[in-house]
């Protein structure tokens, strides 16, 4: 078969998407959710078990042998990106698997581009998915500040929702720039 990069590019082209889309890797990296009853493949945790088991940790099988995909690496060559944005996704199961691939964290830290993250937690709740539940089960408060702490060694700035404006100074105390704005897109006007 084709590589994930080739398949992703074919889908991008079919949908007429102009922007390049770079998968993290063409290698298999599998997220394993650790629970008191033993490890679960992420698909079993998320779909079969509907995120009900208590989370005690995560493993990213295959990450240590994986390499960044060619377009991912190419994005950091030459002048590199103008900016890197960590979207408001689950830090543990969406972003950490990418950071677990050897060389990715180094590429990000070596880049001259500013790097910002948008909080997936608004008012103590996840916008969607099990992020808040996972944070609580891992012994951390489900707050935007805790997400900022998770990324603090990697990012330059953090975007908070207006509902969490009260932690602005604490996030700045981590050495990060802060933007407080409406981050929740409820209507078409919000999305445009």
Where are the regions a protein language model picked out?
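Glycine-rich nucleotide/cofactor/substrate-binding loop typically near the N-terminus or early
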Residues: 1-9, 13, 20, 123-129, ...
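Electropositive, gly/pro-rich neighborhoods at or near active sites that engage anionic ligands
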Residues: 1-62
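Active-site glycine-rich loop that binds ribose-phosphate moieties when present
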Residues: 53-77
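Active-site glycine- and acidic-residue-rich loops that bind
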Residues: 63-65, 90-101
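Glycine-rich phosphate/diphosphate-binding loops that line cofactor/substrate pockets in enzymes
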Residues: 73-83, 108-111
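Structural motif
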Residues: 82-85, 114, 157
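Redox- and metal-dependent alpha/beta enzyme cores, enriched for Fe-S-associated oxidoreductases
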Residues: 99-138
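C-terminal functional extensions of proteins
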Residues: 128-192
